[in-house]
Amino acid sequence: MPQVFPPEFFDYEIKDIDAYAGLLSDARVEISQLLPGRLRGHHTRVRVPAGEISWIKTNLPLRGRGQFPSGAWMLSLVTRASSLSLQHGAEVRAGSLFVHQPGAIHDGIYGRNFSVVCIGVPSHRFERYLDRMPSVRPGRARRTWRVVRASAVGRTDLIERFNGAARTLRHDEAFRVSMTAVESMIDDLTADFVNALRDAIPSEAQSALRDGAAIVRCAEAALISGSEHTLQLDELCRATGVAKRSLSRAFRLILGIGPATYLRHYRLNEARRALVQDRNRGTTVTEVALRFGFHHLGRFSEQYQTMFGEAPSVTRSGSNRV
């Protein structure tokens, strides 16, 4: 059985421009300081076979140029910048996303109090995302890079997720020594980045809308076609063929609610339909609640009242009819 090594961890405290520039020169990156002062910050990186995550924070404006490795896509999210910052001449600020193809040149001005989280994803692992993003696929994209800003909806949450992940990697040793945990984090952040990128590019946003609608329709079909009204979230994922994160995003994009809320509302509607249809059959509210997966009668009544503005017993008796 092959030996599994823990993730490679690198945490460098930036104390001056000379030492940091010397460190980066080994990675074919040139930097220079644009304003007087003492450069401070940190450069943290965790690397596993599935990719790497880097977090760079600096206090002074820098000019930086270099070339990314040829075997990986680089996905970067700016999480903070308090003065003008550029990437390939395009202005970037908190919430800006830039994606570089393998081996691409990067050329930027990084402003005061600049913070960026970068994900390196091996080409073979990133391939699965390219069909969903034709505008960045090599051979179809006009450039080897793309710079956009995440849409206002969800931008703050995206920044916080990336910052939170970076803080965890830097400060939680128990987490970062777990290969499985780090690889899972890379996969989650990559999916978040790709979704944000698609939403920010008009042509990709329309594609995301179509994909989301298709997932929701598939989920609805799974519920309608089966007699199993207590379908769980994991079963819905299997029925639609997508992960929980993708399922959640599709439902929020199309319906404005998460899949768990949708399932609950679906079961409440089915319960209401049964209460109306079974009025003359002697079926009790408890029997209907249990049939549709509500095992706590008090909670069922409360949720039902909130949903329909009346108690289930009122629906069953038909006393609400004019």
Please tell me what each predicted stretch does.
Residues 49-51, 58-86:
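Glycine- and acidic-residue-biased ligand/ion/polar-headgroup-sensing regions
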Residues 19-22, 38-60:
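A short glycine-rich, His/Asp/Glu-containing loop-to-beta-strand
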Residues 68, 212, 264:
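Short, conserved glycine- and acidic-residue-centered signature motifs
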Residues 247, 251, 299-300, 304:
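Short hydrophobic/aromatic patch on the recognition helix
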Residues 215-219, 263-268:
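Generic hydrophobic, amphipathic alpha-helix propensity
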Residues 253-254, 265, 306-307:
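Alpha-helical DNA-recognition elements
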Residues 1-38, 84-227, 232-234, 238-244, ...:
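Alpha-helical bundle regulatory/interaction domains
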Residues 45, 53-55, 75, 97-99, ...:
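Conserved hydrophobic/aromatic beta-strand scaffold that supports enzyme active sites
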